[in-house]
Swiss-Prot record:
Molecular functions (GO terms): ABC-type oligopeptide transporter activity; ATP binding; ATP hydrolysis activity
Residues linked to a glycan: 381, 390, 406, 463, 674, 1050
The name this protein goes by in its record: ABC transporter 1
Gene3D superfamilies for this protein: ABC transporter type 1, transmembrane domain, P-loop containing nucleotide triphosphate hydrolases
Annotated function: ABC transporter; part of the gene cluster that mediates the biosynthesis of hydroxamate-containing siderophores that play a critical role in virulence via intracellular iron acquisition during macrophage infection. Probably involved in the excretion of the extracellular siderophores.
Location(s) in or outside the cell: Membrane
Organism of origin: Ajellomyces capsulatus (Darling's disease fungus)
ABC transmembrane type-1 domain sequence ranges: 47-326, 743-1031
């Protein structure tokens, strides 16, 4: 590189660095005007700034008036002429009235700036949330692959809240303080430039301390937040997958990880508290030291004036300067600046940092943007071939692990192409590349000869439909979910107004209220009727219309979040209907019928092949019987194409495909392949069984939704009302282990409260000592003595604040840590039914751990320390005032009820506002979280604009309601701020009257005045802190209710219950190890079991079920989707309890026994393979028996048996490879095999397999079966399966239909005598 180029590069580097510095310096200003503010926003911003600045002027004006009053009082004290008394009183009355006028102006200005900033902050938060949400909808899939679990939800909640807090009324408070600061210095220099100049040294001292203290505070706060975010992610995954956590009793392992992260946060939080404590102590030390300096220097000026007889420098003038630059800062800025402005700087910085992080995501230009509309670069030929030319691909999160390696393939237009192969061979990746969810690393994907990178993404996706391996539905009605497939259809653009205007939602609501679907359609117009007709036709094609017709609400039925209220098979049918409704030119099916039983699958497959005749169809499948009629079958292995051809050609070549077919062939004798007419009749009845089962399955899930609508039972709900006394009583055991630090904190807080009144005594005597009635030497002597007293108070204040803030911070972090750990434990101890009812979503439950845990600082942290100091000062000030001058004190205290009343109303209205605010935006938040969780589905269907419109509609009502509530709540805040000014006017008027009358001296008056002035200011501050206390009490009540549930509804076995009086410190410690159990199979019996979900007692999911499995048997459960098979597994795990009958394991009724320690002998592999964020080693180890930490050898053995060990060791980091949030860094087959390894590492006596190999190819499945046979010798195994070849060797197969066991026997026996079983088997056979 040449010298010139090096200089150029260095210059560019400096320029980039300068730009970053400028952007960082201006980020807060950019935040205020970000996201296209409207005229209303700009008006609110302008009003807020001007009113806040103007509100800083009245108090300095009062300083001038107070100085004049001091001169008046001095004159009255020195002059005993009674005739002059009335003249002095008249002057005092005039000035007191001016204080009233100034107070009224202050109240009006405060209300304007608080209301303006609050409303501005609320509107900015909504704009940012929408802008960030809109940017998320633009991002490509790779962006979300690298996003930790729950981060998007956290950004949309806590991060936006952080920004809102940093752009609301706190900005006005700081502007008010800065305005006061500037105005005070201007007046001070005008009044006495010399003394003002001497006190300028305060400013750099404050700035230096704030900068250094702020650096360390921010450093520790960032470390704390990082660890809290990590712990929240662990909790979110655990709450979202409560079934797995319960089944493996994995509470302790996840709790250990959760507590470890919180432990790090606790250490950082304590260091942050110490940093803030030092900062607070130094601020008061500087202020009181400056007070002493000012009075000492001021006394010299006054003494010189008295000695020279020069009236130019009066006590009032000196008092004005000292009051504005020192005392005013103590009583005004330092009360609202030390305790508020300094922390506010951190709040603003946090808002700026958070905004910068959000802005980076918002401004991120996605490589694939599916939101751009227009006809430019549209797909010209929609009937051309799809080709992959030398395509290589690796996921951005793992660039060193290629998924596709130089792949070339062609999918002919108008034909059916099938892609098969081993798990992890890249089949689903091909589908993602064709739909342009990702772009290839090398090579190109072309559609009709056009590179799809050159095409408009929406245009490309408008001509295809993708049904993914794990279908995702939105929390809407069946009607709306299917109609979503029409959103970006080029042939149905005329239907857009009806699709996007909310009409379908209104129709679905009407149907749920008993109205007829077609009548409602006609009412809403021809376009709507056309949409509904197309939806019904698509449902027919997807074999979904029958089960939809059986539902009470039909097409108006809500499917729940992510389709949680319907079965997997029903979700797949609705997803297929959604993809077929627009009759796409290209249909991509990625294991689209894997969750269906064979009969349903056969019908759906036939319907798809019929409707896609002459169109392009790409199928990805592991069930090879579903693709044997394909025009071309492409076989993949390890990211490469190994062979292709028709089914017969590939069988003839006897290659990899033929081997897979042989592995899946069922053992059916040739003579049994001829199906009689009676068999076909039986097939019809079998179809009826399927539909009944589907209806029952949906009923059981909808029962959970019904339960949610009923609301929580106060006797068993975390939101139950709790009395204040019982809440306070429960705080005692929490604080008991920390009594030493609590004693230090309380003692220090008492000292802080006492020093305020002590400073009033010193101040009053100082004013009296500097009276011009005294000699110059006496004034100088008083200045030195009382200056020293202020310095002593400064030292006391430093150590008292240091002790109070650090000790209360230490206690707060300890309590927060324990409460969060115990809350997590209590949540995970509740049974599955509790988690799935009463609207207890993982997000809602997580808020107890995060928001409620954090809110407790209002009862244990610096907030409560400040309030205690204020209350102590209140008592001392009132007592001192009555002792010194009770006549003055009584009148001044007359306004206290008004102040307290305003403060109480402020707390009440603010609490109500916060509760309504949280409820108002629940729906909109739910939309954003759901969209992020279903982002691939939204991208594939081009739903970004529709989702954004739905989000905006959800905000209209809440935004107006919140604005009205905010205006009312802020009125009381302004009153609580402004009422203290009227105390000043009353105090000076009445005090002057008493001094002129000779009842009290000037010293007595100023002691009472300063004591009550400080109290008045502190009371105002206490009311600003009161919402924190209110939030803390609400949060504590919820937490205590939750901990109470831990002792009443616990199903998690031998952990110590949280009984009253138990040591919470001990409760938060890790649990004791459980003893290992003996090996060998165990018996399982279900005796006349009936089961209904409590909210739907009239719907029997299981109806008199009898099953008996001997120790060591391999038992299988088969039957149509929704027949109750998975419910049986849930009952065996005691995730639910039977309505009647009993479940016996090893001869013991598990419903009658206490605890669930029997689960130690059971391992469970769910249908949906769930992994947690963490390493492969961590995830497999979660399956170990509680209290046992598996060795590396045990983990590797389990992985070998699950046929995943070789895959793991080929990864760059081996067993230390991070699985990613919800295991998103692994393929479906890899996740499933790890889930099996997790079960096998337990070495259970009973192994439960629920469709545990549905995501595996035939070869992987065969190897896994061999491993399972080896691992489960002597073990009892219960397997649920749709693929009958996986359970051919079962000792006994139970045929479950309509909640009953209709037959049992071996595979050969059931093929011989059960027509429904034989038909199912024939559908899966090749020959």
């Amino acid at each position: 590189m040449t010298e010139a180029s090096e200089d150029l590069a260095a210059g560019e580097s400096k320029t980039a660095k300068s730009r970053r510095i400028i952007r960082r310096a201006t980020r807060y200003v950019r935040l205020l005007v970000y996201a296209e503010p409207t005229t209303v926003d700009l008006i609110l911003l302008t009003l807020g700034i001007l009113a806040a600045i103007a509100s800083g002027v009245p108090f300095p004006l009062m300083g001038i008036i107070f100085g004049q009053l001091v001169d008046n009082l001095n004159s009255a004290s020195c002059n005993t002429d009674s005739q002059r008394g009335s003249a002095y009183q008249s002057e005092v009355n005039d000035k007191a009235l001016k204080v009233v006028y100034v107070g009224i102006a202050y109240f009006v200005l405060v209300y304007i700036y608080i209301a303006s900033w609050n409303l501005f902050g609320e509107r900015l938060a909504q704009r940012l949330r929408e802008r960030y949400f809109k940017s998320l909808l633009r991002q490509d899939a790779s962006f979300f692959d690298n996003m930790p679990a729950g981060e998007a939800a956290s950004r949309l909640t806590s991060d936006i809240t952080t920004i809102q807090q940093g752009t609301s009324e706190k900005v006005g408070i700081v502007l008010n303080s800065v305005s006061f600061f500037i105005t005070a210095y201007i007046i001070a220099f005008v009044k006495d430039a010399k003394l003002g100049g001497e006190l300028v040294s305060l400013t750099p001292a404050y700035l230096l301390m704030s900068l250094v203290g702020g650096y360390y505070t921010q450093k520790y706060a960032s470390a704390m937040l990082k660890n809290v975010a990590g712990a929240s992610s662990v909790a979110m995954e655990a709450l979202s997958n409560a079934t797995i956590v319960h089944a493996f009793s994995a509470n302790a392992q996840l709790e250990s990880k959760f507590a470890g992260l919180l432990g790090n946060a606790k250490v950082a939080g304590i260091r942050k508290a110490i940093s803030v404590a030092v900062q607070s102590g130094l601020l008061y030390f500087i202020a009181f030291s400056a007070n002493g300096l000012a009075f000492w220097q001021g006394s010299k000026t006054i003494a010189d004036a008295v000695a020279s007889g020069n009236p130019g420098s009066s006590v009032g003038t000196t008092y004005t300067v000292i009051f504005l630059l020192v005392d005013g800062e103590i009583f005004n800025i330092k009360v609202s600046s030390i305790r508020q402005v300094a922390p506010f700087v951190q709040v603003f910085d946090a808002a700026g940092v958070t905004f910068e992080s959000l802005e980076a995501d918002i401004n991120r230009e996605p490589k694939i943007d599916g939101t751009v509309e227009g006809t430019e670069n549209s797909l010209r030929n929609v009937s051309g071939n799809i080709e992959l030319n030398n395509v290589s691909f690796a996921f951005p999160s793992r660039p060193d692990k290629p998924v596709l390696d130089n792949v070339s393939m062609s999918c002919a237009a108008g034909q059916h192409t099938a892609i098969v192969g081993l798990s992890g061979s890249g089949k689903s990746t091909v589908a993602g590349l064709i739909a342009r969810l990702y772009d290839p690393t090398n090579g190109e994907v072309s559609f009709a000869g056009q590179n799809i990178k050159d095409l408009n993404v929406r245009s490309l996706r408008s001509n295809l439909s993708l049904v993914q391996q794990e279908p995702s539905l939105l929390d809407r009605s069946i009607l709306e979910n299917i109609a979503l497939g029409l959103i970006n259809s080029p042939s149905h653009s005329h239907l857009s107004p009806a699709l996007l205007g909310g009409k379908l939602s209104d129709i679905a609501t009407a149907v749920r209220n008993g109205r007829d679907l077609m009548e409602e359609a006609e009412i809403h117009g021809q376009e709507t009727a056309e949409i509904i007709d197309m939806v019904r036709n698509a449902a027919d094609l997807a074999d979904a219309s029958a089960f939809i017709g059986r539902l009470k609400d039909g097409y108006g039925t809500l499917v729940g979040s992510a389709g949680s209220l319907i079965s997997g098979g029903q979700k797949q049918r609705i997803s297929i209907a959604r993809s077929l409704v627009k009759k796409p030119k290209l249909l991509i099916l990625d294991e689209a019928t894997a969750a269906l039983d064979s009969t349903s699958q056969q019908r759906v497959q036939s319907a798809i092949e019929k409707v896609m005749s002459g169109r392009t169809l790409i199928s990805i499948a592991h069930r090879l019987s579903t693709i044997k009629n394909a025009d071309n079958i492409i076989v993949m292995n390890q990211g490469k194409v190994v062979e292709q051809g028709t089914h017969s050609e590939l069988i003839s070549s006897d290659g990899a495909y033929a081997g897979l077919v042989r592995l899946q062939n069922l053992n059916i004798r040739p003579e049994e392949e001829n199906v009689s007419s009676e068999s076909l009749a039986t097939k019809d009845s079998y179809d009826n069984i399927i539909e009944k089962a589907a209806e029952a399955s949906l009923d059981e899930r909808r029962s959970l939704e019904t339960s949610a609508r009923k609301g929580e039972d106060n006797s068993d709900g975390i939101n139950a009302k709790r009395s204040l006394s019982s809440t306070l009583k429960a705080v005692g055991p929490m604080l008991r282990p920390h009594m030493l630090f609590l004693f230090l904190a309380l003692t220090s807080a008492f000292v802080v409260g006492g020093t305020y009144s002590a400073s009033a005594v010193v101040f009053g005597n100082t004013i009296g000592g500097l009276s011009p009635c005294k000699t110059a030497d006496s004034i100088r002597s008083a200045g030195k003595f009382y200056g020293l007293m202020f310095f002593i108070l400064a030292i006391i204040e430093f150590f008292a604040n240091l002790g109070s803030w650090s000790a209360f911070g230490w206690v707060a972090e300890k309590i927060t840590y324990k409460v969060r750990v115990l809350s997590f434990r209590a949540l995970m101890e509740q049974d599955l039914q509790w988690h799935q009812s009463d609207g207890r979503s993982p997000t809602v439950l997580l808020s107890i751990i995060t928001q409620d845990g954090n809110a407790l600082s209002g009862l244990t942290g610096s907030v409560v320390g400040t309030i205690i100091a204020i209350l102590v000062n209140l008592v001392v000030a009132i007592a001192l005032s009555h002792v010194i001058a009770w006549k003055i004190a009584l009148v001044c205290l007359a306004v206290v009820p008004l102040m307290l009343g305003a403060g109480v109303m402020r707390v009440i209205t603010m609490t109500q506002f916060q509760e309504r605010h949280a409820r108002a935006f629940e729906k909109s938040l739910g939309i954003t979280v759901e969209a992020v969780n279903s982002i691939k589905t939204i991208s594939a269907l081009s739903l970004e604009h529709e989702i954004l419109r739905t989000y905006r509609r959800s905000l209209k009502g809440p935004t107006m309601e919140i604005a009205q509530q905010s205006a009312y709540a802020n009125l009381w805040l302004a009153i609580s701020y402004g009422v203290s000014n009227f105390l000043y006017a009353l105090a000076y008027w009445w005090g002057a009257k008493r001094i002129i009358a000779g009842d009290y001296s000037q010293t007595q008056f100023f002691i009472v005045l300063m004591a009550l002035l400080v109290s008045a200011q502190l009371w105002g501050q206490m009311f600003t802190l009161a919402p924190d206390v209110s939030r803390a009490f609400t949060a504590l009540a919820r937490i205590l209710n939750l901990l109470d549930l831990g002792s009443t509804k616990n199903l998690s076995g031998p952990c110590q219950h949280l009984k009253p009086g138990n040591d919470l410190e001990a409760n938060a410690e890790p649990r004791e190890k459980r003893p290992d159990q003996s090996q060998g199979g165990i018996s399982v019996s279900l005796n006349n079991v009936k089961f209904s979900y409590p909210a739907r007692q009239d719907v029997l999911v299981l109806d008199g079920l009898d099953i008996h499995i001997k120790p060591g048997q391999f038992a299988a459960l088969v039957g149509p989707s929704g027949a109750g098979k998975s419910t049986i597994v849930s009952l065996i795990e005691r995730l639910y309890t039977p309505t009647s009958g009993s479940v016996h394991i090893d001869g013991q009724d598990i419903s009658a026994r206490e605890g669930v320690s029997f689960r130690d002998n059971i391992a469970f592999v769910p249908q949906d393979s769930v992994l947690f964020e963490g390493t492969i080693r961590f995830n497999v180890a979660l399956g170990a028996r509680p209290g046992h930490k598996p060795t590396d050898a045990e983990i590797e053995e389990a992985c070998r048996l699950a046929n995943i060990h070789d895959t793991i060791v080929n990864l760059p980091e081996g067993y230390n490879t991070n699985c990613g949030p919800s295991g998103n860094q692994l393929s479906g087959g890899q996740k499933q095999r790890l889930a099996i390894a997790r079960a096998l590492v337990r070495k259970p006596q009973l192994l439960l397999l629920d469709e545990s190999t549905s995501a595996l190819d035939a070869e992987s499945e065969q190897l896994l079966q061999a491993g399972l046979e080896k691992a489960t010798k002597g073990m009892t195994v219960i397997a649920i399966a749709h693929r009958l070849y996986t359970i051919q060797k079962a000792d006994v197969i139970f045929l479950i239909e309509d909640g009953r066991c209709t037959d049992k026997g071996t595979h050969a026996e059931l093929v011989e005598r059960s027509e429904s079983y034989k038909i199912n088997a024939l559908h899966q056979a090749f020959e």
